[in-house]
From Swiss-Prot:
Segments forming a coiled coil: none
One Gene Ontology biological process: gas vesicle organization
Function text: Confers stability, involved in shaping gas vesicles (GV), hollow, gas filled proteinaceous nanostructures. GVs allow positioning of halobacteria at an optimal depth for growth in the poorly aerated, shallow brine pools of their habitat.
Stated name of the protein: Gas vesicle protein C2
């Protein structure tokens, strides 16, 4: 490159610098004008003041948030450290447990001791079964057999008593009562015949009068006899008792066990003597 070329280049550079300087001067003038305008404009000042207050508030809030974040970070770090310590302790305990599990000699000893206890308990149970339980069961069976035999003997005795009383004594007593009633009827008939024979030979008027008297007396005597026979069934009947139609005896109630002595049930008793047959004293009403 020649000197002329250098000179032209420098001239161009100077011209460019001059243009830049002029542009900078123009920009400086415009910037100064803008600054002056902003300084003189109160609205821009208020906006700047509000913006500065907002920036200050934000800075305070940001500082508070940063402090809170630092506190939370510290707490989280402490929790992490505690968790890490717990995991370390668990790892140590787990390793110890694993080592203990690998060593099964103690378990074998415990199992063998348990087997020995089972053998001892089995031996004791077998001894108890042979020496105490089996004899006790045998004695219990013997007592049960003796009790059953005693019950059987008592039942047979009761059956014999029932047979003697309800099948022998009661029918005999009923027959005696029927014979006594028949004798009483015969006596009443004989007395009436005697009265007719005694008053039958007088004159007509006297005979008529005597016959009327005899008839009246006979009626009275017959009525007395009838009343005497009917008295046990009506007037002398206890108010709190009821008569059995089979044996004609009086009881507080006609029950199934009593009817079984006559080989009869309550249904059969009602079929025989009617559905309204009294079974209790209150049934008369």
């Amino acid at each position: 490159m020649t000197v002329t070329d250098h000179r032209e280049a420098m001239i161009e550079a100077r011209a460019a610098v001059t243009d830049v300087r002029e542009a900078m001067d123009a920009y400086a003038e415009e910037f100064a004008a803008d600054v002056n305008s902003i300084r003189t404009d109160s609205r821009h000042r208020e906006n700047i003041r509000d913006m500065r207050a907002a920036v200050d508030a934000y800075c305070e809030s940001f500082a508070t948030a940063v402090s809170t974040h630092h506190d939370e970070t510290a707490a989280l770090r402490a929790d992490l450290e505690a968790t890490a310590a717990a995991f370390d302790a668990y790892t140590t305990a787990f390793a110890a447990d694993a080592a203990a599990m690998h060593d099964v000699s103690a378990l074998h000893r415990d199992i063998e001791a348990l087997r020995e206890e089972f053998r001892a308990v089995t031996t004791d149970f077998e001894d108890y079964t042979t020496d105490e339980f089996a004899p006790a069961v045998g004695a219990l069976h013997a007592d049960a057999a003796e009790t059953a035999a005693s019950f059987t003997a008592k039942q047979e005795g009761f059956e014999a008593y029932r047979h003697d009383v309800h099948e022998s004594a009661v029918p005999a007593l009923t027959a005696d009562i029927a014979a006594t009633r028949a004798d009483f009827d015969d006596t009443a008939a004989s007395f009436a015949a005697y009265a007719r024979a005694f008053y039958g030979h007088t004159d007509d008027a006297t005979a008529q009068t005597d016959a009327d008297d005899t008839t009246a007396q006979t009626d009275v005597l017959s009525g007395q006899a009838t009343v005497t026979r009917a008295q046990p069934e009506e007037d002398d009947t206890p108010e709190d008792m009821v008569q059995c139609r089979v044996c004609e005896e009086y009881y507080q109630a006609i029950t199934e066990p009593h009817l079984q002595t006559h080989e009869m049930t309550i249904d059969g008793y009602r079929d025989e003597y009617g559905e309204d047959v009294p079974l209790r004293p209150d049934d008369h009403a």
